[in-house]
Amino acid sequence: MCTAMRRTTFTRTFVGGTLSLLAWLLTSVSCHAQDWGGSIAAVSDYVTRGLSQTRGDPSLQAGVHRTFPHGWSLGAGAATVDLGDWIDANYELNLNVARTWTLGERWSAQLSYTRYIYPDERGDHDYGELAGSLSYHDLLTATIAYFRHVSVYSRGTTAWSAEAFAIELSALQPVSERWSLLGGMGYYELPDPFRKGYLFWSLGLAFSWNALQLDLLRIDTDRTARQLFGTDRAGSRWSAALMWKF
């Protein structure tokens, strides 16, 4: 039996994590087994869990995915990043495996694992993300994500190869054939020795025309994130993305 599903693309500008993010630029995946798809995008500011991965600069991103019977899918992606001199990484790669279940006519669930790789980094910044999500009509999605071997650097505090988690709530509301409203918020519990976390949220518009999609988002974080990471990575910012889906 065919399992209908919708996938997030590799770009993660919206609320972040594995959603993310544009983390809520959704591509429809047909029910035919072993389908290929993908996207190429230019993003004005690459943001994950409220933090800029390019320090406010643009990012080029690309991703491909393949769906299989019974709700399985595989994906891979790449993006340009600027994580600062202490990491010195210019590229981010990811590999993803996911399983999606339909739960009646209204609900669906997904479990995924993503490995993030920084091939030219200083040190070992690679990490894994295990995420589970529950969606209602593909309009409202709740996600919890667990991060293993993640490293976080801030002003005066460093977590090296530690564990962290995030929770996110995302909404997608079509208002016409081409326009949709996007919104979301989440909480990221930072790894030890931070002993704290921060809130992040976003609101925006998406316009789609054939294989093209244009998004404009307003993203913000709470004061804790701004104090830890500075305004070049955290705080209020605009992010726009132009994507071609194939």
Please describe what each predicted stretch is.
Residues M1-D35:
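Cleavable N-terminal export/targeting peptides
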Residues A33-G84:
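Short glycine/proline- and aromatic-enriched beta-strand/turn motifs that initiate or cap beta-hairpins
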Residues G56-L60, A89-L93, W107, D124-G128, ...:
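Residues that define the transmembrane beta-barrel architecture of outer-membrane proteins
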Residues Q173, L203-L212, R218, D232-F246:
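Outer-membrane beta-barrel "beta-signal"
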